[in-house]
Amino acid sequence: MKKTVVVFLMLGGMALPGRSVAQTFAHGQSSAYEWPTDPAVRERLEAWQDLKFGMLIHWGLYSQLGIVESWSICSEEEDWIPRDSAVSYDAYKRAYWATIDAFKPERFDPSAWARAGKRAGMNYVVFTTKHHDGFALFDTRQSDFSIMHGAFKDDPRANAAKWVFDAFRREDYMVGAYFSKPDWHSPYYWWDRYATPSRRHNYSIEKNPWRWNQFKEFTFKQIEELMNGDYGRIDILWLDGGWVRPGRGASVDMPRIAAMARGYQPSILIVDRTVPGEFENYRTPERGIPAEREEDPWESCIPLGNDWGYVPTDVYKSPAEVIHILVEIVAKGGNLLLGIGPKPDGTLPEEVVARMEEIGKWLGANGEAIYNTRSLPVFRDADTWFTAAREGGKRYAIVCLDEGQPIPRQVSWKGNAPLPGGRLTCLQTGRTARWTRKGNVVTVTLPKGLPAGLPAVAFSWLPLEGRDQDR
């Protein structure tokens, strides 16, 4: 994944009308969507849509260095790619590869990660089995550039991906394997005969078909290692590096990969990011949120900090910011995959754990308005966002409150108004709230004793039978 300084990050702490984040994406979002035809895949997709909140874990050699993922070995000139200008590119790249001999996460405990995520209200995980640098966090037989051949090789937990997947399954997560299609360590992708001027393969596939076929086979076999049952049930195959695609002359033969994956893992969701078609079972806008409600399945992947992996100086979003982001995404019909970067020793930063605890406190009281919901045609009125239970017809209004400000005495919204005689329940307290309706405007008197700093207050009601309330 790519770090890009976008308007979303710049606006994170500002009080904006409606509190909607900017619609700027780090990668181009697919403009078309193709629904899966396999009923089992559709069923898995529906179950995934119920989960709403997941954890994306970036962890690897870049964590040891405390830098922005593996992008520093890409020679593109970008201000977000850090590299010591006093060191030649080739020398830097050699030093980066050598980090395999230093990465030794002796406090690695993925069960603690899973418990922290569960306390935060997360229900699925996507773990980086291999980022663009090619360093595998699983026991691959296709390359020696893996955690099984570095400083951690003699530790019983060396097959990190297996430990992660097992730990998260024990906490009842849906489990996803992140896998980078580009591999900058592979001589079949970056051939050492030539310079490596960009993230893309550095030779002509047309002139060197054998070499690219070797890369396709290498990619197929690595994915097969993750899919063949050695790592248990995998619910999502999350493929990054969308510039490796047929439309850019770099096919890895996705039909063959998908057939193999579903042969081992029936009904697995396949997410070939930003490549529209049958192998992108849901879309993944990065670092942003679509401007409008979308009925196709989608997920915004957004880091808790500025970076995906661990950077010691990173600045993290507040719990209120994350909750506001989650509320907006769910009201528009999507899921939030929140990026978390463990430290090189294998522990989560204390600031991350503290924020996850606070997010979980709010979801513990108000999660009914988030989980197992779907979006409504009228999904928003200023700072109020609306959702509906997937079953049963219950409606929800979630009013996002100004961070750092006293809780108001009353809140109001237009649209999705309960009809006279309906009961409105404040989810935070579980009690009936006093409300009035004038025309299409609902005004609710907030109950006393709400926690200071509450980021949002949610209400539920049942529509009266046979009556339309969405006016």
Give the predicted meaning of each segment.
Residues 1-4, 117:
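Positively charged n-region of N-terminal signal peptides that target proteins for export
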Residues 5-6, 133:
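Intrinsically disordered, low-complexity segments enriched in glycine/proline and serine/threonine
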Residues 16-21:
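Sec/Tat signal peptide C-region and signal peptidase I cleavage site
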Residues 23-471:
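Mature catalytic domains of secreted/periplasmic carbohydrate-active enzymes
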Residues 6-15:
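Bacterial N-terminal signal peptides
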Residues 4-5, 333:
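Residue-level detector of intrinsically disordered/flexible regions characterized by low predicted structural confidence
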